[in-house]
């Protein structure tokens, strides 16, 4: 687990993509840590190294076969952190975003931010029990985010935003990186989190 601690009052759990704890995830952990949060990023892959972007197929199959969308470990971490911190927020990217979406219903976290969780479309019955921010890319290959937005529109405690980019638009190390939309999405996430922690 990647941990960045400085005796802050609030904690963020960062859930990575299929690639593991790579430079993008480390960068995101640092950004949120520098804004006043202790950071906990569990290695969901439980392997020595992360996958490279060129290993997408291998990374996807590894995640599907060895990890999946079981929220138990994340929920246990939330429970541990709730004993030490005022607020615990989960932020996920891609598959980590789908996991964070699932945790919005089942865990004791205080808020969820989901960056382009494409598999949320398989879990539209989830009913968030905490403030939940869903950030989607407009150009997804496998589905139409606007249709997903319509299906989730009646959910309480949920905000849904579509940004003009492709899957991974907040990842500075990805060909999909969109600096302008990334800045907008990050600001939205910070505004959302600030309201939760007061």
What does each of the following model-derived ranges do?
Residues 1-83, 171:
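Serine-hydrolase catalytic machinery in alpha/beta-hydrolase-like enzymes
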Residues 27-28, 143-152:
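Short alpha-helix in the alpha/beta-hydrolase fold that links the catalytic acid
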Residues 82-93:
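Alpha/beta-hydrolase fold nucleophile elbow
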Residues 92-96, 100:
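Gly/Ala-rich beta-loop-alpha elbow adjacent to hydrolase catalytic centers
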Residues 102-106:
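Active-site signature of alpha/beta-hydrolase-fold catalytic machinery across serine-
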Residues 108-118:
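A conserved short beta-strand
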Residues 128, 134-136:
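Short beta-strand/loop motif that positions the catalytic acidic residue
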Residues 158-198:
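C-terminal catalytic histidine-bearing segment of alpha/beta-hydrolase fold enzymes
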